[in-house]
Amino acid sequence: MALSPNRSVTIKDVANHASVSVATVSAVMNKNKYVSPELAQRVRESITALSYKRNSFAHGLKTRVSYKIGLIVPDITNPFFTNIARGVEDVASAHNYSLILGNTDEDPEKEKKYLQLLESKQADGLIIAVTARSHEYLQSLPIQHLALISIDRSLFDLGIDTVMVDNRAGARTAIEHLIALGHRRIGLVTGIRGIAPTEERLLGYTEALEKHGIAVDPALIAVSYARVGGGERGAMQLLALENRPTALFMMDGTMAIGALQTIAKSGLRCPEDIALACFDDFTWAAVMQPRLTVIDQPTYEIGQQSAHLLFERLQNRKRAPREIRLQTQLIVRESCGAMLR
């Protein structure tokens, strides 16, 4: 099939090349009607052969979609959210969607500005890890046209699709592992209070202690924030206690780096003098000295699942909301002291 070099390839050209109707090409591209595998493959081969690229703007005018979705997270530099973003983007790209990314730093005002931006850009959907104080606030926002998915923070009680891990079980597993190693004074450094991950992990911590007959000591719980500096501050508070803990559990991987820095500055050794474990497993956790014992979260899968849910919601706005809870995994390395036994 010879085309003029100055003319753009059209959907009609693809249909002629594949010997199918324009409607069949459209169905294959939009994935909204059944097409036999043989015909679908023929269409895809013609699209590749002709280097056809759909005009998303023109298509959007016809279908009233923008081919844009938003992803709003507290901090994209946190590897937890970096991996989630990659999972979201891979699925979005497969659906020919672009991604608009925003960082809130847990600030409701910044969150509001990003939501207003998405409104102005007429985004079709939004995946969000809401700020600590924004549940009622979200209900009041003019975002009714957006398909909405919550990650890492539960909004299921508001009828919103949610994807997150079983934080309670993950924390309980970590604390029981430390107890099995002989620790009874286990310090906990939390993130911001009032958000689901913090509250659920705190509950898992207390459940594990109570199950083994260990009283919960409020002095062993330090409230901080999910950054390296937050880990330093929280660990410093706990190590300054007259009867300091023999083990620390950090609610975030970046906080564990800060904890290790504080342990070293205090003249202590990890794990010989104090054991350490944390949520989140990243590449550096396996190469640090000591290598970190972690509760691994399937971050890329969280991103994928949330994006899949979003596109399901775009196809069917009336379906019942779903909550997906993914499982965590304990990975035992050196920092907990298990290798010393």
What are the language-model segments listed below?
Residues 17, 22-26, 61-77, 177, ...:
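Short beta-strand segments enriched in small/hydrophobic residues
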Residues 50-117, 121-125, 203-206, 210, ...:
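Amphipathic helical "hinge" segments at domain boundaries
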Residues 100-102, 127-128, 188, 294-296:
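Short catalytic-loop micro-motif centered on adjacent basic/acidic residues
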Residues 1-67:
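N-terminal helix-turn-helix DNA-binding module of bacterial transcription factors
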Residues 105-108, 129-134, 254:
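Short beta->alpha connector loops
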Residues 56, 110-114, 136-137, 230, ...:
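Short acidic active-site motifs
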